[in-house]
């Protein structure tokens, strides 16, 4: 990847969504707003969620588009939204962090693995949940750009 996939302006805390659908739309709007995807990609994010949950555990969900929506990705990017109150992603699946991902080609796999590394460490998850705001959150997770 030649450019940072995560920039400070794509980190939002707190997010304003109260439902899973609102959170996916909020993440999608950030990706569209930065020029990474077309609006059709956001529709594909919702379509994927209807087929398979993107809940990952550890308060995390990673909504992303379908294979058919690859053509709607302009450049690789991700956004992170943290919510003060948990969003019910599914039965018994509380989410406070939503990471929207768009990856050109196979880049989404390396992006996913970097996010997984961060969220596989319980101490890191607690830091992300406790971060004072978007600047501190960005500092904690900017390693996804490495």
Predicted regions and their residues:
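Cytosolic covalent-transfer regions centered on His/Cys nucleophiles
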Residues: 1-146
């Amino acid at each position: 990847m030649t450019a940072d996939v995560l920039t400070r302006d794509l980190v939002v805390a707190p997010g304003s969504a109260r439902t899973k659908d609102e959170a996916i739309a909020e993440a999608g709007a950030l990706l569209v707003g930065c020029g990474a995807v077309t609006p059709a990609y956001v529709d594909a994010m919702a379509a994927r969620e209807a087929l398979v949950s993107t809940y990952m555990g550890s308060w995390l969900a990673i909504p992303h588009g379908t294979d058919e929506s690859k053509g709607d990705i302009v450049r690789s990017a991700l956004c992170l939204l943290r919510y003060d109150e948990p969003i019910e992603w599914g039965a018994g699946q509380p989410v406070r962090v939503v990471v929207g991902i768009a990856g050109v080609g196979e880049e989404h796999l390396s992006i996913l693995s970097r996010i997984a590394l961060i969220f596989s460490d319980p101490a890191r998850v607690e830091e992300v949940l406790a971060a004072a705001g978007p600047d501190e959150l960005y500092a904690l997770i900017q390693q996804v750009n490495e």
